[in-house]
Amino acid sequence: MAFPKSLPARLPTILPAAALAAALAACHREAPAPSAPTVAAPAIDTAAPIPANDAEQRIADDVRTLADDRFEGREAGTRGYDLAADYVAKRFAAIGLAPAGDDGTFFQAVPLLKATREADGAALAVERNGREIALRFGEQFLPAPDFNAAEHDLEAPAVFVGQGVHAPELGHDDFAGLDLRGKIAVVFGGAPARFDNDRRAFYSAKREKLRALAEHGAIGVVMVNTPQDEAERPWTQTADNWQRPEMRLRGADGKAVDSFPSIRGMATVSAAAADLVFADGPRTAAQLFDAAQAGALQGFALPGTLRLAARTKIEPVASRNVVARLAGGDAALAAQHVVYTAHLDHLGIGAPVKGEDGREDRIYNGAIDNALGVAILLETARTLKAESPAPKRSMLFVALTAEEKGLLGAEWFATHPPVPADALVANLNIDMPVLLAPSKDVVPIGVEHSSLKATLEAAAKDVGVALSPDPFPEEVVFVRSDQYAFIRAGIPAIYLDGGTESADGVRDPKLALRKFLRDHYHRPSDEATLPIYWPDAVRLAKLNARIGRRVGDAAERPRWNDGDFFGGKFSRGK
């Protein structure tokens, strides 16, 4: 997955990558076997299950191929990702789908800007009462890559603005009584716990937070980590990968989309160094951390000034979504499209991590996240292509780029679809299904927002699978994967995840999820050698296909529920 997913570690991040050589055969069964791994396989609790039928074997083969070291982690904008995209395009062709990308190909170009921070010239200094406190790069702070300028150096007064949330419909304003114009905002992440999950998700999003800060006149931003932030993602993990590039969509003018140029510098400070930022202020970092937990944060002006400086290497790069189409069978409805998605990219090559065998690995292969999701997407496409008659509405199958960079491939597709925008009726997304213990259920995320709930329930009965509620609703993963780009475009969407109820009373899917998040998520050990339970992967593909079939054949297109927060904010015409 991509941007911050919490839990004991459910967080998308961002890392680098690059390579592979030989051409891939067009036929799935002719695809070359994965090369021998360059490092020892990660330790696992049980032996990886052996695929028991053709469907399980197809999914296993796709996962093992896409998660092989030859693809070097499939980072967006690298040769390794492009070779993975070539593989998926050949699989789409072998299934019998039509190309639906640019110029009659399977590929939709996605223009990106890549920004990489440089250690030289980076500074964060606190000027208080005639003394300067210089924070240490990497250990105490990291500058954010600047998409607007190769170099910045600014000094200004600072204001603590709580979590930087302005939610007038909830009577909440962190900016009340504060003058942020021409100043540097010091801010915590997240949103008040009293907000419902939907609004907390929306106002926690980095894009909305930066927009609010820019609108209130901030010229710089210092994000201060809390202990809760670092319980989910330790500062050392962030600091070890400081050279990872970040990306934004590149507009027609060559500039980054949503880069907020009025904010001229940004940095993040570790929780351990927070007291340096708040030195000589009216409240200590510990007091503010407690206030954040209690929902009682109040902003204030800080004494003295802050200085932010950084250098960034900015360069244009290109990546590709892989897009295929299954034509609908009804003359009146075939122009409408159900969009299936799974992100193809992962984290590439990053900081080496020592495995349980003592050996280091730098390739973040992303077997669960999200080679497995792409393999399920391919099996879904194969299932629907084999059905006769075809669904009445058409189906689009999209392997997306740059999810790990902030849902960029999905955002580009949702705003630049190969068909008229109004022709997209629903999005069905799969991302990081942690299928490491047999379950009797599936967790559908986001079903409460639209009429897709009834469709999903009927499809689940068709397949014979139980549905369970989101086990971690406070983590609002509904806005943390590619479906959110479609939601922002006004398109009802759901996201299918693995189940949480044990099928055999022995192996616990919840425990397996927590272990994966703790030990393997966004680490090199997310390998195809993990004990993926292939029958659950096949079942998820069947359910995915049945949902799409029911949406495809329905008399009415899906609609947002009356009064829904996301429908009200993003539905077409808003």
Task: Give the label of every model feature segment.
Residues 30-101, 273, 335:
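N-terminal hydrophobic or amphipathic helices/low-complexity stretches enriched
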Residues 139, 248-283, 400-505, 511-512, ...:
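Metal-dependent peptidase/peptidase-like ectodomains
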Residues 162-235:
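A conserved hydrophobic secondary-structure block that centers on an alpha-helix together
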Residues 204-208, 212, 229, 348-354, ...:
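Acidic/histidine-rich catalytic neighborhood of metal-dependent amide-processing enzymes
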Residues 382, 497, 502-570:
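His/Asp/Glu-rich mid-to-C-terminal helical/loop segments that flank catalytic regions of hydrolases
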